[in-house]
Amino acid sequence: MNFRVGLGFDIHELIAGTTIKLAGVSIPSNKMIKAHSDGDIIYHSLADAILGALSKGDIGMHFPDSDLKNKNLDSGKILSHAYSLMTNNKYIINNIDITLILEEPKIKKYKDNM
């Protein structure tokens, strides 16, 4: 059996806003994530881990911020792209652990939808 391990990491500045998107869920907040795409750091980290495990670079290679079509891009599309590369190469995910370091907003009531 062939195992591959990927490690994804994402960090962004928080700025004034109304919503933070995490794992596809929009969470009301007085801040937002400053990013070229929608800034979903959970989807970005997971996509980056998949791409890394496949030795396919990172999300910046696949979705450069210099390309205007990626402006405000739904990060679900980034994750779907990485997942498609994984399944097309006949790999599966065995285990995922995501650590979110964020003081606010509190996400407890949103976790089940994430």
List the predicted regions and their residue ranges:
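A short glycine/serine-rich beta->alpha loop
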Residues: 27-37, 65-70
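Active-site microenvironment for binding and transforming phosphate-containing groups
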Residues: 5, 16-24, 29, 87-113
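Histidine-centered active-site/metal-ligand motif
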Residues: 12, 36, 44, 62
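Short acidic, Gly/Ser-rich segments with clustered Asp/Glu that frequently serve as metal-coordination loops
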Residues: 12-14, 51
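Glycine- and Gly-Pro-enriched alpha-helical subdomains that act as flexible
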Residues: 50-95, 103-104
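Short alpha-helix carrying the canonical HExxH Zn2+-binding catalytic motif
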Residues: 39-50
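Short amphipathic
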Residues: 3-10
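Glycine-rich anion/phosphate-binding loops
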Residues: 39-40, 72-77, 108-112
